[in-house]
Amino acid sequence: QAVIDGANEAGGFCFLAHPFERGSRVGPDLDPIEWESWDVEGYAGLEIWNYMSEFKGLLRGKLWALFYAHYPGMGIRGPYHATLEKWDELLAQGKRVAAVGGADAHGKTYSMGPLSRQVFPYTHLFRCVNTHLLTEKPLNGNRGHDKALIYDALREGRTWVGYDGAAPTKGFRFRARSVANEA
């Protein structure tokens, strides 16, 4: 709570990252790092999908690790249901909780015997789970102007999460209508 309060007091904001995570017995650095303090307040949002958290959960053994290190798309399925259920629960309580998704990119190289592989290169990870922002005005290249628009969009929850691993989501549009043509 102190970190969230400090960030807010300094004009920043916080997101709860990888709230639910499965670890892997393949290595100690693959233990789950889940969010536990659900009684905190004042955070801006929740990371509803973390690519590397999902990848880590696929690694049930060394053979699985070798396979998914080369073919991650064969196992990546989407946000954990527990995360989406928690987000729904928080929203049902009347809390404003923005959604973000992330790559959790570290570009670390892992070795297993004579084999080594970077899991995963930044160029791969930044084409996977991405947070898209809906800004009130177009970005114009001015750092101060653009920073304010980006921070406002994040803080206010004008975001959506796309999986660019399947197909590019840039420019994607969606609409919702009710019987009365309201959304």
Predicted features along the sequence, with ranges:
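C-terminal functional module detector
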Residues: Q93-A99, A103-A183
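Domain-core and long-helix interface of multi-subunit machines
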Residues: A2-P121, K137
